[in-house]
C-alpha cells in the first residue's frame, strides 16, 4: 500500500519502473504531459481515484475526481480545461442512488470549474472484485506557458494558497468514525480560477507550481526541491494550519505537512512578484488563508529544512502508509 500513498516509495516506483524513459514528454514526470501545439501547449493529465469512504465531510469521490484532474492541469498553466473523460469501474450491486449522488456531484464540480465531461466508459465487476467504485478522469487543456514543478530558483519565495492537512484529517476521521471535535471538512475544490488569477498577477514571476496531494506539502516540496536543484527552508511559524486540524493531527501522531490536501497549491514566486501574487491569491475565496512559508536557496540542494523558531532540522520525505486511499 505504501507505493500508492505518496512520498518516496511511490516516487521511486514511478521513476524506476513505470515511467517511459524513451519518451521525452513522460520522462519529465510532472503533473501532466505538455505537448507542443504551435506556440501553445496541449496539457494532458490522468488520475484514478480509490478513496475510502466514497463520501466524506466536504466532498465525495465525484467532486474529488473532477477537482483533482482540473488542478493537475492548472498546476501546469492550463487553467481553462477543454474537457474531461470519465471512466467508472463499479462493483456488482453498487447502489444506484449512491451512483446518482456521485454523478450529480461531478456535474456541479464540472460547472464550477468550467470543465465539461466529453467522453466516458463504464465497467462492472463481480462482488468483492473491486471495492465499490473506482473512478478515473483524464483532462486536457491549453497552456500559453507551461509552468513546471522543477522551475524553482535560489531566492524564490514559496506561497501556499491556504491551510494544510484539511482533506487528509477529514477523510481519516470519517473512515474510522472518529469524534475529533470541531468542524473537520475536506478542502477539495477546483483551483483553476485561483491559479488563473495568480498567473495574471504574477506572469513569469511564478516559477513553479504543484498541488500537495498524497504525501502532503512535505512530499511535494521534496519533489520540487530535487527536480529544481535547490534547497528549501520553511518557516514552521508561518505554516497555516487550522486549530482543529492541528489538534487532530497531534492526537493521531501525524504531521500536517505530511497530510494530503485537495484544494491547495504551492507556488514558487520571484521575490519581486511575491506581494502582487499573494494579494491576488488572498482576494480569491479559496485563497484567503494564503501565506509565504519559505524560501529557496543554493544550499543543501534537494533538501527541505524546517525552521522551528528554536532551531533548524531536516524535514524528511514521507514514506510508508501514512494515509492510504486518501484520493
Region roles according to the model:
Residues 5-166, 171, 180:
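Glycine-rich phosphate/pyrophosphate-binding loop regions near the starts of catalytic domains
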Residues 269-275:
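Helix N-cap motif at beta-to-alpha junctions
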Amino acid at each position: 500500500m505504501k507505493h500508492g500513498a505518496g512520498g518516496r516509495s511511490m516516487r521511486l516506483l514511478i521513476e524506476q519502473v513505470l515511467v517511459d524513459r524513451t519518451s521525452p514528454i513522460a520522462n519529465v514526470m510532472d503533473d501532466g504531459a505538455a505537448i507542443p501545439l504551435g506556440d501553445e501547449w496541449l496539457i494532458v493529465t490522468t488520475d484514478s481515484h480509490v478513496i475510502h469512504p466514497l463520501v466524506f465531510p466536504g466532498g465525495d469521490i465525484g467532486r474529488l475526481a473532477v477537482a483533482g484532474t482540473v488542478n493537475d492541469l492548472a498546476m501546469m498553466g492550463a487553467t481553462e480545461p477543454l474537457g474531461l473523460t470519465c471512466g467508472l469501474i463499479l462493483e456488482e450491486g453498487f447502489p444506484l442512488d449512491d451512483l446518482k449522488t456521485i454523478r450529480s456531484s461531478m456535474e456541479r464540480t464540472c460547472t464550477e470549474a468550467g470543465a465539461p465531461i466529453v467522453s466516458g466508459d463504464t465497467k462492472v465487476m463481480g462482488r468483492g472484485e473491486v471495492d465499490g467504485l473506482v473512478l478515473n478522469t483524464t483532462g486536457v487543456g491549453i497552456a500559453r506557458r507551461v509552468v513546471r514543478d522543477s522551475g524553482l530558483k535560489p531566492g524564490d519565495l514559496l506561497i501556499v494558497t491556504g491551510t494544510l492537512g484539511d482533506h487528509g484529517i477529514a477523510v481519516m476521521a470519517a473512515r474510522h468514525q472518529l469524534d475529533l471535535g470541531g468542524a473537520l471538512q475536506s478542502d477539495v475544490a477546483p483551483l483553476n480560477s485561483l491559479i488563473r488569477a495568480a498567473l495574471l498577477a504574477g506572469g513569469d514571476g511564478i516559477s513553479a507550481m504543484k498541488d500537495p496531494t498524497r504525501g502532503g506539502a512535505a512530499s511535494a516540496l521534496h519533489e520540487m526541491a530535487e527536480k529544481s536543484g535547490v534547497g528549501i527552508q520553511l518557516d514552521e511559524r508561518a505554516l497555516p494550519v487550522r486549530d482543529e486540524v492541528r489538534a487532530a493531527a497531534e492526537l493521531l501522531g501525524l504531521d500536517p505537512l505530511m497530510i494530503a490536501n485537495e484544494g491547495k497549491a504551492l507556488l514558487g514566486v520571484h521575490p519581486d512578484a511575491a506581494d502582487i501574487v499573494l494579494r491576488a491569491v488572498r482576494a480569491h475565496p479559496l485563497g484567503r488563508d494564503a501565506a509565504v512559508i519559505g524560501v529557496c536557496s543554493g544550499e543543501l540542494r534537494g533538501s527541505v529544512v524546517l525552521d522551528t523558531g528554536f532551531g533548524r532540522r531536516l524535514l524528511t520525505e514521507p514514506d510508508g502508509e501514512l494515509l492510504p486511499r486518501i484520493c
